[in-house]
């Protein structure tokens, strides 16, 4: 039987940028170094380069973790956590769909708890989280079409 004091809570408050030119807003932050969590699709289609060009323009160092796969496993999250602990970025940017965003949030969660258990308070700071979703409503389109068929 669980006790009330066994309950734990963690909340991530992401900043989600969207719209034409939203990627440029990353340069408006005072980041020294960021870690980008993404997948190979974002690399292949050039979206990662768009982001790294903005970071380069603002002299923000970055490290890319592009091992995210659909429905990421705990092993993927652990690999991402290793990158965070080694690089100690100011921010974590999730670039991609739900898998990249979920992976980044899980990495931050474990980073925060790992830090509390093993490190002094100032060794690693919880990185700021930015989500840059690239998914479209295209996947929802068949559902929307089906819903509108029954309307008069």
Where are the language model's segments positioned?
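Conserved beta-strand elements of the Class I
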Residues: 35-36, 91-93, 130
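A glycine/threonine-rich phosphate-anchoring loop and its flanking beta-alpha core
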Residues: 6, 14, 112-152
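Cofactor-binding loop segments of dinucleotide-utilizing enzymes, especially the Rossmann-like FAD-
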Residues: 38-39, 67, 132-134
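Nucleotide donor/acceptor-binding cores
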Residues: 31-34, 127
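N-terminal amphipathic/basic leader segments beginning at the initiator methionine
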Residues: 1-30
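Glycine-rich phosphate/diphosphate-binding loop of Rossmann-like nucleotide-binding domains
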Residues: 28, 35-53
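N-terminal small/polar loop signature for handling phosphorylated ligands or for N-terminal nucleophile
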Residues: 46-123
């Amino acid at each position: 039987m669980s006790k009330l004091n066994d309950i734990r809570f963690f909340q991530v408050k992401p900043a989600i940028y969207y719209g034409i030119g939203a990627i440029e807003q990353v340069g408006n932050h005072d980041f020294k170094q960021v870690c980008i969590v993404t997948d190979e699709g974002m690399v292949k289609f050039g979206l990662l380069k768009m982001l790294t060009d903005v970071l380069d323009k603002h002299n923000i160092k970055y490290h890319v973790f592009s091992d995210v796969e659909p429905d990421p496993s705990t092993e993927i999250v652990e690999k991402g956590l290793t990158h965070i602990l080694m690089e100690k970025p100011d921010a974590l940017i999730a670039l991609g769909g739900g898998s990249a965003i979920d992976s980044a949030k899980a990495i931050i969660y474990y980073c925060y708890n790992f830090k509390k258990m093993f490190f002094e308070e100032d060794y690693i700071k919880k990185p700021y989280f930015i989500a840059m979703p690239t998914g479209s409503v295209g996947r929802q389109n068949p559902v929307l079409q089906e819903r509108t068929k029954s309307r008069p």
